[in-house]
Amino acid sequence: MFHATTILAYKGKNKSVIGGDGQVSFGNTVLKGNAVKIRKLNNGKVLAGFAGSTADAFNLFDMFENLLQSSKGDLLKAAIDFSKEWRKDKYLRKLEAMMLVLDRNHIFLLSGTGDVVEPEDGQIAAIGSGGNYALSAARALAKHTDLDEEELVKSSLQIAGEICIYTNTNIKTYVIEDEK
């Protein structure tokens, strides 16, 4: 379980959105409440969020971004190549971390054990200590409301932040809209 992080991604009809809270904890102490755990990649066409050690996040983001560039923006190929590299590298294999990556076509959960998982519904995925709360809220809101994609992510993370002690309600979202 990765404490101090909740990341939620939603691939809707018109937009793909990823959001995260801002809390960083060490044991039972909140160290920071406004951390940003999400990055835009590939000129904003891919969004990525991270759960795990903050120090490792920058290396993993850079590694994934390089693979995304070498695959000419093909998210599926980059995700698979990233997973292979993560499993092969002795240092990276020891990391207990997860990433969510998405574009307008795909959403993937990448784990430190080399898994590349596309959610069954192809629309909603969450990671981190409040991930299950955010995922549950997002599924319910998607099914029973007419919230737009960004509001759905914000509302779901708000709910997670009200339940999970390792998640706060300082929510940051990033959006990819359909090209016009």
Curated annotation (Swiss-Prot):
**GO CC terms:** HslUV protease complex; proteasome core complex
Q: Which reaction does it catalyse?
A: ATP-dependent cleavage of peptide bonds with broad specificity
| Enzyme nomenclature, EC number | 3.4.25.2
**Principal localisation:** cytoplasm
What is one Gene Ontology biological process annotated in the Swiss-Prot or TrEMBL record?
A: proteolysis involved in protein catabolic process
| Regulation of its activity | Allosterically activated by HslU binding.
- InterPro entries in the record, alphabetically? ATP-dep_Prtase_HsIV_su, Ntn_hydrolases_N, Proteasome_sua/b, Proteasome_suB-type
Localization recorded for this chain is: Cytoplasm
Per the UniProt record, one Pfam family is Proteasome
Per UniProt, which keywords does this protein have?
Allosteric enzyme, Cytoplasm, Hydrolase, Metal-binding, Protease, Sodium, Threonine protease
The family note in this entry says:
Belongs to the peptidase T1B family. HslV subfamily.
Classification via HAMAP family: HslV
- Its recorded name reads ATP-dependent protease subunit HslV
Q: What is the lineage of its organism?
A: Bacteria, Pseudomonadati, Campylobacterota, Epsilonproteobacteria, Campylobacterales
